[in-house]
Amino acid sequence: MTDGGAKSAVKRAVGKLPSAAEAYQAWAAGGRPPAAGFALERLQAVLPAWLQSVDRAGPHVRLAPGRRLLVFGALSWWIEYAVALSLLLTAAGHRVDLAYVAHRRWMDPTDDFDLRRQQAYLARLLHSLTARIRLHDLSRARIPEMPPALESSLQALDKIDVQYTRQREALDLGVGGEDQTLLDLRSRRNRHVAAGVLRLLQGGAYDAVVIPNGSILEFGAAYRTARHLGVRAVTYEFGEQRERMWLAQDDEVMRQDTSGLWEARGGDALTESEKQAITDLYRARRGGQLWGNFGRQWQSAPSQGALAARQSLGLDPTRPIALLCTNVVGDSLALGRQVFTDGMADWLAATVRWFGGHPETQLVVRVHPGELLGAGHPSAEIVRQELPELPAHVVVVRPESPVNTYDLMELAHLGLVYTTTVGMEMAMGGIPVITAGATHYRGRGFSDDPASMPAYLESLERRLAEPLGRRLAPEVVDLARRYAYRFFFEYPFRFPWHLVRFWDDLEALPFDAVLSPERWPQYAPTMRALAGEAVDWSIA
């Protein structure tokens, strides 16, 4: 046996001894987390100041009535965020419990010895919270037999987790399959969390559970368990805007359900300043520029004009062009959003296959720039698998391409999307759009939304046969612009700290500033929504 193998064997044996890992963590390791774990030194350093800020908070912060809340966190960055959020909710007068798991990575196994050391490390680090917040470590919650409906839901989540991790929809889950080991790991982890949340919610009268994301990993397990029991689940995430968060109640926030907002505000005409704001945002997105509190550049290069794009791609101006904009395969904004295909990759393959037999048309596949960060099943490969000899009328624009998507939109006769917001923007420009996934703007009145493959292909043929140069009716374009304004400017909730820039945002807006009489009122509606109070979308 190698030295490494012997060490692992010893750790496995010691990991089964009561209190051995905890004693090692306290005495031999000097409180340092295991190499396989994670450290939260920044959180440890600022916790005393955060607690003092909460104690100093004035009566203006209290939100009546106080509610009982369970806040959940997993992975180091979300645990840091969950602690800060729990303290804000405590300052607002709520009774808060914080549940978490101690695993460093969602895709790697952790032996019992290191896991128990990490648990001991977190328990010690978070101990100062216990005077105000009850802590629950769900890392090794005993797994009972799950209710059949919840078990079925968790099995669906397990598969989504593997797709998310592998960044591909097609999985090898046969005996000995390369994805089966990961599926087994995700199954155990999700059931530990589900079991712990089930026990807590059945044993206490919680008003709401507050969960990041809610669509994947342990976050999805907590969400699905809360909904199984009928307990209000509040999910939250962060997009491209600073000082804003996305928030949903009794839904996965990544589905971005705008139904309540659209019902309350969809009929309101845009004011002149609102029209200008959406026009300026669109111009910035096209030009690859930062704008307002949007912290992302949407294009790697500014617009060079439609003519330059046509010439660089060799497109024929006499034949209709369909612009297909992909999602990132395996992204949580696209997983589980299928309507009439098995997923985004299946839809892309079916669409490419159809266009391969229709040379009287042209298809431009604009691959999402996010694939530059990695893709288990790249969109370009999906196209090649369907059309190994790529015909001239099917063009793939790779994620690293400097070709500006908005230049391609000027050339497009038809837009094809799964869930990306580019479809909404094409409709704003008068381009008919067909949606294939359950995107938030599906059914809002400015896109074609087929519910079956035959209906999709019929819509394709009909739209492509329309005269070149035709555009959507002005009232439909106006509807798309109204929706886009509501989505970009009114759907996000005001909040001081973005997850990606958490520590920088905290330096700019520390606890005392957020809890001050001057700033707290602008965040109070978000805090009420996070606590599970119904959102009044009629208030702009």
What are these model-predicted stretches?
Residues 72-82, 211, 333-336:
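A short, glycine/small-residue-rich beta-strand->loop->alpha-helix junction that serves as a flexible
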Residues 247, 434-479:
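Nucleotide-sugar donor-binding patch of glycosyltransferase catalytic domains
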Residues 192-248:
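Conserved nucleotide-sugar donor-interacting segment of glycosyltransferase catalytic cores
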Residues 76-98, 102, 223, 343-356:
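Histidine-anchored nucleotide/phosphate-binding helix
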Residues 287-385:
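Conserved catalytic-core segment of nucleotide-activated headgroup transferases in glycan assembly
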Residues 380-399:
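Nucleotide-activated donor-binding/catalytic signature segment of Leloir-type glycosyltransferases, i.e.
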Residues 2-68, 91-191, 238-302, 504-505, ...:
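Conserved N-terminal ligand/cofactor-binding loop architecture of enzyme catalytic domains
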Residues 244, 401-448:
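A donor-sugar binding/catalytic signature common to diverse glycosyltransferases
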